[in-house]
């Protein structure tokens, strides 16, 4: 009996532990902790992400849902479209030049989508825990703030400037991960919110601290010259200003800190050497995006139906350095063909569902979804492991606030019951399809990258170091550090493709 009780208690705690996965990944990344068994931080984050996504996929397989946020027409659309989408992605992967890369890429994005569904269910069942996790996620970039402020202090003192990005080998990895955290901070969930039962002085202290943290996050974006993230932030705030006029007063926090951080940045530019700034904000040019976008359109023109295969953009001609095109819609249609186009079309009714219920959704959680969507048009926010998980976490939290409709579970056997049970069929169809997809995606990920997950002291390698799935995006597998493959990157590339 004791053992049975202990097992039941452990099973009840498992969903709570799953909720801690994303904040733990963010803590490891922002704190520059080396809690992984591979050489590069990015590869370690990816392995952690794979494990977490497979666990969430497993939860989804055994998840029992008694309500739905989707209308009957939307459920029918999903029930029809999901098998077609899955079939097209399988066909795209099989015909790709590097089919293992394509299969792993398809599995990754399918598991990301399923994790939204799974985490939204967990958030509905544990709303208080979810709110507290949101508050902690919002504060985790403070580790980077401390690193930046330390670097500024050294620069003001005339000392050597240390690299303050720490584990983030690419500034876009940091800036894209910071975007969801910024909107979560502005939402002020859980204990970050004003509380009438709290001491007024404590309320003012917390509010003042949030203003300081928000300005610090904005300062990071200014110093990185993060044009895409800043534009996405403004679009998200603009959406709130236009479609949530009841929340205008809440815009004071982001707008004042946006302005204050900008003025501070300009002042520091006159005091500190300009080379402390990664990129100027008002720079001209597309940073090579136009060449990347032209390549995606060429690839889609050559492979309009099935695409070149997931994660095959980087290995396809013409050769370009970048591992992804910095535009998710173009990435999907060039790599997946009709499957990518169908996935984008499915986002339209889902977005309309959010828009229809915008008045009851947390205003900055809604703004975060808009901002991430815009950022995905210019950056790799949905390509890099940390920003992927933080963005997906924000989406799932937003989904959990949508109104739900209970499914009928009555045991009555009259005609009315038969009609009601029929109305549940579309929901049950796409739910069962998602569970099948989750199993296939987990098995695919284990088949392709199972050896990489357990590879100790390993790293990815190629001659270019353009991140995509791994830090070195042209590699398929990790190889032991110090091996012959590391010393001859071109050979390693041929082997790992």
Regions found by a protein language model. Give the residues of each.
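Transmembrane signal-anchor hairpin modules in multi-pass inner-membrane enzymes, especially those
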Residues: 1-90, 125, 131, 191, ...
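Flexible juxtamembrane loops connecting transmembrane helices in multi-pass membrane enzymes
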Residues: 256, 260-293, 315, 454-467
């Amino acid at each position: 009996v004791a053992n049975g009780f202990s097992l039941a208690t452990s099973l009840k705690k498992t969903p709570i532990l799953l909720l801690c996965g994303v904040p733990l990944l963010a803590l490891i990344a922002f704190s520059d902790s080396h809690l992984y068994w591979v050489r590069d931080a990015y590869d370690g984050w990816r392995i952690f992400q794979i494990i977490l996504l497979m666990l969430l996929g497993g939860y989804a397989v055994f998840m029992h849902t008694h309500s739905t946020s989707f209308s009957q027409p939307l459920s029918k659309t999903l029930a029809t479209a999901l098998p077609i989408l899955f079939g097209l992605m399988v066909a795209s992967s099989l015909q790709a030049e590097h089919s293992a890369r394509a299969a792993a890429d398809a599995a990754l994005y399918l598991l990301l989508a399923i994790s939204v569904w799974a985490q939204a269910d967990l958030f509905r069942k544990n709303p208080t825990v979810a709110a507290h996790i949101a508050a902690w996620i919002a504060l985790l970039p403070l580790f980077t703030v401390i690193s930046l402020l330390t670097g500024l202090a050294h620069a003001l003192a005339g000392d050597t400037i240390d690299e303050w990005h720490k584990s983030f080998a690419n500034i876009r990895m940091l800036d894209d991960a910071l975007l969801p955290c910024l909107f979560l901070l502005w939402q002020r969930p859980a204990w970050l919110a004003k509380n009438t039962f709290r001491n007024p002085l404590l309320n003012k202290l917390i509010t003042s601290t949030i203003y300081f943290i928000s300005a610090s996050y904005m300062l990071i974006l200014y110093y990185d010259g993060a044009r895409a993230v800043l534009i996405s932030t403004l679009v998200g705030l603009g959406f709130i200003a236009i479609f949530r006029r009841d929340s205008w007063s809440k815009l004071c926090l982001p707008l004042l800190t946006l302005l204050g951080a900008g003025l501070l940045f300009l002042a520091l530019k006159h005091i500190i050497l300009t080379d402390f700034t990664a990129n100027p904000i008002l720079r001209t040019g597309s940073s090579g995006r136009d060449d990347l976008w032209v390549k995606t359109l060429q690839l889609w023109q050559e492979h309009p139906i099935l695409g070149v295969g997931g994660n095959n953009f980087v290995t396809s001609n013409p050769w370009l350095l970048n591992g992804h095109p910095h535009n998710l819609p173009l990435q999907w249609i060039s790599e997946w063909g009709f499957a990518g186009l169908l996935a984008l079309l499915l986002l339209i009714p889902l977005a309309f569902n959010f828009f229809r219920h915008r008045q009851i959704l947390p205003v900055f959680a809604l703004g975060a979804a808009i901002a991430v969507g815009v950022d995905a048009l210019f950056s790799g926010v949905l390509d890099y492991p940390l920003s992927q998980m933080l963005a997906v976490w924000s989406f799932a939290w937003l989904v959990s606030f949508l109104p739900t409709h209970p499914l009928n579970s009555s045991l009555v056997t009259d005609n009315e019951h038969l009609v009601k049970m029929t109305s549940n069929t579309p929901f049950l169809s796409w739910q069962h399809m998602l569970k099948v997809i989750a199993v296939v995606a987990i098995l695919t990920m284990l088949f392709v990258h199972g050896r990489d997950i357990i590879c100790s002291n390993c790293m990815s390698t190629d001659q270019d170091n353009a991140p995509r799935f791994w830090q070195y995006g042209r590699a398929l597998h990790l190889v032991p550090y110090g091996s012959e493959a590391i010393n001859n990157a071109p050979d390693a590339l041929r082997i790992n493709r």
